[in-house]
């Protein structure tokens, strides 16, 4: 594996009591948490949602495994899915990103090809398996599936088969309901257990319209977004968000982030004649649910295409936004746009994280949105006001004809987790004087004015870039400590707008061995992308290239940041094998055992860190890349705690391919330290 594999980065991808004055006080005096608010992991033995709970906190109250004994962790069981992409046209893009969920006594997961599997949580023995039989010859934009969602019918008259259901979205845009006990399709849902999501959506290319994340469930309503292929054209599929009856599959409502008439609430911030032919602004990541208020919190991505906006002038409101939608009727409650007129592929990829904060003695329901820019934004999740001030700051202007970059962007007052400053030639890094010199030349030859430097015909350095910052792995939160944990990328990319006439010539040329090309049909420019690498294939910027970071919201500061990943098996043979941190995909979880677990890095290690200090306490070399977010649960008569991660590799990162699900636990009979004893 090498950094050069990153040349195909297609990541398609709150109360009225809080006034601006109160928000300002928050920064001065800090915030405190009530002793008891939302219960993190209501049933400590379950991880019943992709994010642990409906709030997406990626936190477990289990503490059998803790910093005092985590070094004893051993493999409890390993399951192999058998899915390695045989016969798949886009085999090179196959990524096993699933986070299992535990419900109804079984562990449920999906493969990259949407095969749903139920396992015994104690042994890893397969209980059932369902294959939706997607067409493997199609050229899907992404080949990934992050997980499934589960639902239980509370109607006492409907307690037979399919009273408990598993919902999964597919690469060919179906929403499928399965009986949780048997894996059989629920015949009363849609047509023979499935709903075709391509209905009532403009489809330009069926291979560009997918579902890659688990749906959100609010009561008996299933809410689903979509993944839309990046950069092929302006008029790609629109990012319509839809809701379906969990029992029948009947559509209840839809919400289109892009206006198609002047009555649309975002119409004033688009060129309306252009908006009707624009696509995307879709929600391809994981949504979160505020069950008390009946809201679904939805992160959206860029309108199409990513790197040229001359055909979608305006701020493109509702794209690159956090939306709060009433799940009962599909009405927008509030929205906050975190990138105006996106030209960088800065989709909101991370799952929103819902927490309860106490301000001036008043509990405030909040939501935290992590971003690819490395900024964290916190809002009152009922009304939408910022709880930490946001300032509109001037950013570099575009010099590309026809483009109108936004003159300002919203900057959070929470410390950024990535550098926002201009990259200078003196910042070049290398293993030798020679490659550092080459990196100096590369940096000097491209446009870079810091964060939000627009794409340019001479090539612009994007730092942070479209892989993050924080990507779909999101954040973990220890609500009692009010601490955030995030895996953060620090790898600049170069984006160059090129003439469509030279696209084929450049794509075939040996002059661009590390580049990825996209047509952006309907615009004057195609696009070329590549990591900012030295001739040796290592980044031109100093390490760390990936970090694990802890943020204290009470004090509004970064507590610690440590490299995530080593250069073991990466780069040229003479490169130092050090804990330099690597680019990664996947996110962390935190536990009451004072631990943060994370895989994600390119070296295929699964790691545990001390939550308080960031010290690495344990690591295990997985049999394949662990580019997924782990989960944990308690099972069996001994109430044994397990930590599970999918290890199947990542096509874009080029990590080792595999089909493993690996569960770790303390050895049976191992001494466990009682909670609270150090």
Residue spans of the language-model regions?
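Mature N-terminal segment immediately following signal peptide/propeptide cleavage
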Residues: 40-84, 99-102, 549
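N-terminal secretory signal peptides that target proteins for export/translocation
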Residues: 1-14
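Extracytoplasmic/lumenal domain signature
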Residues: 71-84, 116-138, 152-157, 175-206, ...
């Amino acid at each position: 594996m090498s950094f050069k594999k990153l040349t195909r980065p297609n990541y398609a991808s709150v109360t009225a009591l809080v006034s601006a004055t109160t928000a300002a006080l928050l920064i001065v005096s800090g915030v405190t948490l009530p002793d008891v608010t939302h219960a993190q992991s209501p049933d400590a033995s379950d991880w019943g949602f992709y994010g642990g709970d409906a709030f997406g906190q990626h936190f477990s109250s289990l503490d059998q495994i803790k910093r005092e004994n985590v070094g004893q962790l051993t493999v409890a069981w390993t399951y192999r899915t058998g899915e390695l992409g045989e016969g798949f046209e886009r085999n090179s893009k196959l990524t096993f990103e699933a986070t299992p969920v535990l419900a109804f006594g079984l562990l449920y997961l999906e493969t990259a090809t949407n095969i749903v599997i139920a396992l015994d949580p104690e042994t890893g023995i397969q209980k059932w398996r369902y294959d939706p039989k997607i067409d493997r010859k199609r050229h899907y934009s992404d080949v990934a599936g992050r997980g499934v969602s589960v639902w239980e019918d509370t109607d006492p008259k409907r307690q037979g088969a399919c009273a408990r259901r598993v919902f999964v979205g597919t690469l060919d845009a179906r929403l499928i309901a399965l009986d949780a006990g048997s894996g059989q399709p629920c015949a009363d849902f849609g047509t023979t257990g499935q709903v075709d999501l391509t209905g009532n959506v403009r489809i330009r290319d069926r291979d560009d319209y997918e579902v890659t994340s688990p749906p959100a469930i609010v009561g008996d309503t299933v809410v689903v977004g979509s993944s839309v292929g990046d950069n092929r054209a302006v008029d790609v599929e629109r990012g319509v968000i839809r809701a379906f009856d969990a029992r029948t599959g009947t559509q209840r409502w839809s919400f289109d982030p892009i206006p198609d008439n002047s009555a649309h609430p975002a119409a004033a911030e688009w060129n309306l004649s252009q908006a009707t032919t624009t696509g995307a602004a879709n929600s391809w990541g994981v949504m979160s649910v505020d069950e008390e208020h009946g809201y679904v919190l939805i992160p959206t991505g860029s309108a199409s295409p990513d790197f040229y906006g001359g055909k979608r002038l305006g701020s493109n409101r509702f794209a690159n936004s956090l939306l709060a939608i009433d799940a009962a009727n599909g009405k927008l409650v509030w929205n906050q746009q975190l990138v105006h007129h996106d030209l960088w592929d800065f989709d909101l990829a991370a799952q929103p994280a819902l927490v309860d904060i106490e301000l001036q003695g008043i509990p405030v329901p909040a939501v935290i949105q992590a971003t690819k820019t490395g900024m964290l934004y916190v809002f009152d999740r009922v009304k939408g006001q910022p709880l930490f001030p946001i300032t509109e700051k001037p950013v570099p202007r575009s010099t590309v004809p026809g483009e109108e970059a936004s003159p300002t962007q919203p900057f959070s007052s929470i410390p950024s987790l990535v550098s926002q400053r201009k990259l200078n030639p003196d910042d070049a890094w290398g293993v030798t004087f020679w490659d550092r010199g080459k990196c100096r030349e590369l940096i000097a030859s491209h446009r870079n004015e810091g964060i939000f430097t627009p794409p340019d015909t001479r090539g612009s350095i994007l730092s942070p870039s479209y892989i993050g910052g924080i990507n779909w792995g999101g954040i973990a939160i220890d609500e009692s400590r009010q601490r955030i944990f995030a895996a953060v990328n620090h790898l600049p990319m170069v984006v160059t707008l090129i003439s469509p006439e030279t696209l084929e010539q450049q794509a075939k040329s040996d002059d661009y061995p590390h580049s990825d090309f996209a047509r952006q049909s309907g615009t004057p420019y195609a696009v070329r992308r590549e990591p900012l690498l030295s001739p040796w294939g290592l980044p031109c910027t100093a390490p760390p290239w990936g970090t694990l970071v802890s943020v204290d919201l009470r004090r509004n500061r970064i507590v610690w940041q440590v490299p995530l990943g080593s250069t073991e098996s990466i780069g040229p043979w003479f490169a130092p094998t050090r804990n330099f941190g690597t680019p990664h995909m996947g996110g962390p979880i935190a536990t009451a055992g004072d631990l943060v677990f994370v895989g994600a890095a390119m070296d295929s290690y699964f790691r545990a860190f001390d939550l308080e200090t960031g010290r690495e306490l344990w690591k295990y070399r997985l049999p394949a890349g662990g580019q997924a977010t782990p989960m944990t649960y308690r099972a069996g008569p001994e109430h044994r705690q397990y930590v599970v991660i999918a290890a199947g590799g990542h096509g874009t990162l080029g990590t080792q391919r595999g089909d493993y699900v690996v569960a770790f636990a303390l050895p049976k009979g191992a001494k466990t330290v009682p909670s609270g004893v150090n």
